[in-house]
Amino acid sequence: MSMSNMSGGSCAATRLTWWLESWCESNDPNFTAKAADVVGLYVAPPAKAIVLCVDEKPSIQALERAQGYLKLPNGRALTGQSHDYKRHGTTTLFAALEVATGKIIATHSKRRRRVEFLDFMNSVTATFPNRKLHVILDNLNTHKKNEDWLKAHPNVQFHFTPTSASWLNQVEVWFSILQGQSLSGTSFTSLKQLQEHIDAYVNAYNDRAEPFVWTKKKVRQRRFKGRRITQL
């Protein structure tokens, strides 16, 4: 017997009963200035400069899942994956999205410490020699307090999103595309196979890459009140 039958309500009412709304609220006192700085780089980038969105996608798991099908009573076959899986390790993907072209620079790492972040930034700067680089980042601790590296790279300027507002970073959109188009529902027999799979996707994506177009007219700091309904 379903819960809707037990409670005497409709399926829609039962779903609403267990509905949980969630969000991440930014309490950054400098939200407006930081958001304007980031959005300004999207809609009016400095002349002859490169704007990059940089972040990492940590702990991408190489999971090996059994593939197969289940024959249903009506004769149809239901294909899918087993709930069980075998772990083959994880990789952290560092990525830089070039705002003007939509193209991706990506590399794999075992960890995501400051040293790995700066190693990636060294490879990014080498890709654009003698160019002014504006790099959009979130507020991860490894992204902050890199004054010595910035002094050694005077052509690079970091721009930080407001706290709890990493959605302003366009590379987060690309990570979502990567997950939906390339990683969801996959199975890998080794960490190397996962990394090669991601690399092949990045290459194919860059062949057809187009820049994201910023269309939101206003970015405002929102204040929410929590609501949770659990009563039957």
Model-derived segments and spans:
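Conserved short alpha-helical interface segments
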Residues: M1-N27, I50, E56-A62
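Mobile genetic element proteins and their domesticated derivatives, centered on retroelements
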Residues: S7, C53-D55, A96, G102, ...
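Extended, low-complexity cationic-aromatic segments
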Residues: A35-L118, V219-Q231
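RNase H-like polynucleotidyl transferase catalytic core
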Residues: G80-Y85, A152-Q170, T186-F188
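Active-site proximal helix-loop segment of RNase H-like, two-metal nucleases, encompassing DDE(D)
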Residues: I104, V171-S190, N206
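Acidic, metal-coordinating catalytic cores used for nucleic-acid/nucleotide bond scission
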Residues: R112-R113, V135-N146, T163-L168, Q193
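Short, basic/hydrophobic alpha-helical segments
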Residues: V115-H134
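C-terminal domain-tail junction helix/linker
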Residues: Q193-L232
